[in-house]
Amino acid sequence: MILSSKMREAALKFGDDVKAAREGLGLTQMGLAKILHTYSSNVASAERKGLTPQSKLFFELCDELGLEPEDYGFQADLVYLAKIAEWRKKTHYER
């Protein structure tokens, strides 16, 4: 997927925030990966390259690290809005 410069900037900010939140919780990349049932290389890639809401891992990281998907200013297309609504519904019912 080719990202606009604005979306690329948002994805990179997300990666920086993931790293800061993970380190703030005292977790290693491997530790966070175990919690999320994924590979540490996926966490490392998310921190280095960032992610967009098209990735399931984007929302899993938001859930685990207390990040808000809306804070990253991604283009508000219908798919994105539906994913945000789904995430909101899930987090409100599970907490």
Language-model segment annotations:
Residues S41, T52, L65, L81-K83:
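Short Asp/Glu-rich motifs
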Residues L36-P53:
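Recognition helix of helix-turn-helix/homeodomain-like DNA-binding domains
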Residues V18, L32-A33, V43-A46, Y72:
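Conserved hydrophobic/aromatic packing and binding residues within compact polymer-binding modules
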Residues D16-I35, E60, A85-E94:
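Short basic helix-loop element that most often maps to the first helix and adjoining turn
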Residues K49-D63:
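Short, basic-rich loop-to-helix N-cap that marks the start of a DNA-contacting helix
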Residues M1-G24:
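A short, Lys/Arg-rich alpha-helix, primarily the initiator
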Residues L3, D71-R95:
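Short, charged recognition helix plus adjacent turn
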